From Swiss-Prot:
PROSITE patterns: PB1, TPR, TPR_REGION. It is found in: Cytoplasmic vesicle membrane. Keywords: Cytoplasmic vesicle, Membrane, Repeat, TPR repeat. Residues 1-10 have a biased composition (Basic residues). Carboxylate clamp type tetratricopeptide repeat protein that may act as a potential Hsp90/Hsp70 co-chaperone. Contributes to polar growth of root hairs. It is a peripheral membrane protein. Interacts with myosin XI-1 and XI-K. Pfam families: PB1. TPR repeats lie at residues 52-85, 90-125, 126-159, 406-441, 443-472, 494-528, 553-586. The lineage of its organism: Eukaryota, Viridiplantae, Streptophyta, Embryophyta, Tracheophyta. GO terms for molecular function: myosin XI tail binding. This is Protein PHOX1. Disulfide bonds: none annotated. It comes from Arabidopsis thaliana (Mouse-ear cress).
Length: 745
């Protein structure tokens, strides 16, 4: 993004006279030049960012239209317009990875590359990690998929997608005999590290080194040439050749410094990975009001702990290390075994606390010694870089910035604690005491007689919740059955028939799955009338689907397809009738004050818990009952009307009876006499029906719903679960089947 700015700077510079002020940068002209260049750069950058956001939206729209190449082209242009550190770069790279994944398994390596670029821009972008894990899983690189999903879970323990991938890959690895527990142990504290941040740190270190070497020279040409050669010789090119710095000058020096940055990047990343392999635990070091974080290995010794404490509290001359046992006493730790015992007793609290008590040096106990002094010093130094405010992240930070941040936050925390009198330890003790008293009190309550009735209410609610889960699961399959079929513009009839047949099998399979879930809901809760009504709707739609599909061949009463359609209509009527009956019985019990709700309400009032359930007024309940009855009768009438058409075309004499009952249901639903007359007039049995114009009951039902929609849904339906059922439109696949099989061949 620096090229346009560079051109403007060069143009402005050439127009300026080569005066001393312009050359040295000490005059006003140089300052105005910098200000104008910065303003021009900001204006251009704003334009580029706005254009990139427009390209991102265009790419999203093309992705929704399944134009993955076009979407990828827009995303790529947007990335090129944005700065490298912009927040949308990771999102755009991940979107490009999604496009590659949609284009087939052969493009998965490209998707992985885009995810890598996204993680360079934003190392903690979990979506990129998840997509890369899916690609690795599909490419059978299960160890990489295991790593990425584990890293996401380290950042977001409640991430459902990451947990699914992790468990799935873990199961396969266990089946192959791989020790996944050891792998998981090594990854439990691993966090993503950004290459951009590491590169910045390394450049800063090189800048300091260069400045130091420059100050050591005497100012002569020979001294300058030696300092430049020293820096350039320290940085090797990829093919291993050394460059003569005396002839190349400053440009080659900067290039070599960049090469050295890349080499040091790899070294820093490698050292970071090596350090992450050590499994550590989080420890709180408590010295009066001063509480500091530290990271200690799981197998750390008491000598290592002592050295870390000395490093964190350098003012202490002598001290005792203590822990609080299960009885609340502070016990002094003198050996490594005692340290491990203390860690095991406090495992359930999440963080391990060590209390430091200052004593004179001659009162300090003699700790058991270890031989690995070098590793102890190394870890003590590493732990000292952890922020005092509790920041224990794995990211590498510059020493100067880290020290400044620690000092400011620590001062603020101390000031805040002193001002408000905050004591974190007392809160934890109060919590433990409260939980102990709560457990003892609950033991007496749950064994009483009143608790058994409350348990019955809770069991009934959980039973209804389980049935509702199956009901919603069935609704998902009903929605999947509405999948639209897309035909190619230049497709032949054979291609269209293949597409239609595939769509029919898909919808039929989803209808069967939905029926299975609805039946499961009724098995869990026998009076769950919503599932019965939904089952009737499912069987009704499946009957229509099979009927339109049967039109592709000879249709008569003896054919198997016709018999299947009539059986589905019979089942749909039975489900609708049973659901209506259960609902009417529940309404009757509610009006008489003997419903389960009234029983539960009376019991809760005795226990002083009457505010748990809310109850509608009598007027609202009456309106809700009328609306529910209207909707059920409307659904039932549509079913009977469609059945009368099927029976008429099959030559069954019972078609007129079905039509009469359908009219009765529409009247009970509150349909106007004009609408009913139009519906009867356009029945396929009527001589007045328009020839070649098939009347669709779905269309008039939809019109009724839209006409009275605002009024009905303002009042509300007493069961929100049935709203998707009542608002459901007829699938377009039915019309496609009818047009393909009953139209001109």
């Amino acid at each position: 993004m620096g090229k346009p700015t560079g051109k403007k700077k060069n143009n402005n510079y050439t127009e300026m006279p080569p005066t001393e002020s312009s050359t040295t940068g000490g005059g006003k002209t140089g300052k105005s030049f910098d200000r104008s260049a910065t303003k021009s750069f900001d204006d251009d950058m704003t334009i580029f960012i706005n254009r990139a956001l427009e390209l991102k939206e265009e790419g999203n729209k093309l992705f929704q239209k399944r134009d993955y190449e076009g979407a990828m082209f827009r995303y790529d242009k947007a990335v090129k317009l944005l700065p490298r550190d912009h927040g949308d770069v990771a999102y755009l790279r991940t979107s490009m990875a999604s496009c590659y994944m949609q284009m087939g398994l052969g493009e998965y390596p490209n998707a992985i590359n885009e995810c890598n670029l996204a993680l360079e821009a934003s190392p903690r972008f979990s979506k990129a990690l998840l997509k890369r894990a899916r690609c690795y899983e599909a490419l059978n690189k299960l160890d990489f998929a295991f790593r990425d999903s584990r890293v996401v879970l380290n950042m977001e323990p409640e991430n459902v997608s990451a947990n699914e991938i992790f468990e799935r890959v873990k199961k396969v690895l266990v089946g192959k005999g791989i020790d996944v527990d050891e792998m998981e142990k090594n990854l439990v504290n691993v966090q993503p590290v950004g290459a951009a941040r590491l590169r910045k740190i390394v450049k800063e270190r090189l800048r300091k080194k260069k400045k130091k070497s420059m100050t050591m020279t005497n100012g002569g040409n020979d001294g300058e040439r030696k300092s430049v050669e020293a820096v350039v010789e320290d940085a090797k090119v990829d093919n291993g050749e050394e460059v003569d710095s005396g002839r190349k000058g400053k440009a080659i020096e900067e290039k070599k410094l960049e090469d050295k940055v890349a080499v040091m990047d790899k070294e820093v990343i490698a050292s970071e990975i090596k350090e992450d392999a050590t499994v550590t635990r989080t420890v709180k070091l408590v010295h009066g009001d001063d509480i500091r974080w530290a990271q200690l290995p799981l197998d750390s010794s008491v000598v290592l702990v002592r050295d870390v404490i000395k490093d964190r509290f350098p003012a202490l001359k002598g001290f005792l290390i203590k822990y609080r046992d299960s009885e609340g006493d502070l016990v002094t730790i003198t050996t490594t075994d005692e340290l491990r015992l203390a860690a095991s007793t406090r495992e359930k609290l999440g963080s391990f606390r060590l209390y430091i008590a200052e004593v004179s040096p001659n009162q300090e106990p003699t700790y058991d010694v270890i031989d690995n002094d070098e590793s102890t010093d190394k870890f003590a130094k590493g732990s000292s870089s952890v922020a005092d405010n509790g920041s224990v992240g794995d990211f590498v930070e510059s020493e100067k910035a880290s020290t400044s941040l620690e000092h400011w936050i620590f001062q603020f925390a101390q000031l805040f604690k002193n001002h408000v009198g905050f004591d974190s330890d007392s809160y934890l003790e109060l919590h433990n005491l409260g939980m102990k008293l709560y457990t003892e009190a609950m033991e007496d309550i749950v064994t009483g007689e009143d608790a058994q009735e409350l348990f019955d209410i809770a069991a009934d609610k959980f039973q209804e919740m389980a049935a509702l889960a199956m009901f919603n699961w069935g609704n998902v399959h009903m929605s999947k059955a509405r999948r639209q079929i897309y035909f190619p513009e230049d497709g032949s009839r054979e291609t269209i028939l293949e597409k239609v047949e595939a769509g029919f099998e898909w919808a039929k399979n989803e209808y069967n799955k939905a029926a299975e879930k609805y039946e499961g809901a009724v098995k869990i809760k026998s009076d769950f009338y919503e599932a019965l009504l939904a089952l009737g709707q499912q069987q009704f739609e499946q009957a229509k689907l099979c009927w339109y599909h049967a039109l592709s061949g000879e249709v008569d009463i003896e054919s198997d397809a016709s018999q299947d359609v009539l059986k589905l209509y019979n089942k749909a009527e039975e489900s609708m009738e049973k659901g209506m009956q259960i609902w009417e019985e529940m309404e009757e019990r509610r009006l008489n004050g003997i419903s389960n709700f009234d029983k539960h309400k009376e019991l809760l009032q005795k226990l002083g818990l009457d505010g748990i359930f809310s109850e509608a007024s009598d007027e609202e309940s009456a309106e809700q009952t009328a609306n529910m009855s209207s909707q059920i009768n409307l659904l039932w009438g549509s079913l009977l009307y469609e059945r009368s058409i099927v029976e008429y075309k099959l030559g069954l004499p019972t078609w007129d009876e079905c039509l009469e009952v359908a009219v009765e249901k529409f009247e009970l639903a509150g349909a106007s006499a004009t609408d009913i007359a139009v519906m009867v007039k356009n029945h396929c049995s009527s001589d007045n029906a328009l020839e070649g114009m098939g009347f669709k009951i779905d269309e008039i039902v939809q019109a009724w719903n839209e006409m009275y929609d605002a009024k009905r849904w303002q009042i509300g339906v007493p069961s929100f679960r049935l709203e998707p059922l009542f608002r459901r439109r007829s699938p377009k696949l039915h019309d496609i089947l009818e047009n393909v099989f009953s139209g001109p061949q």
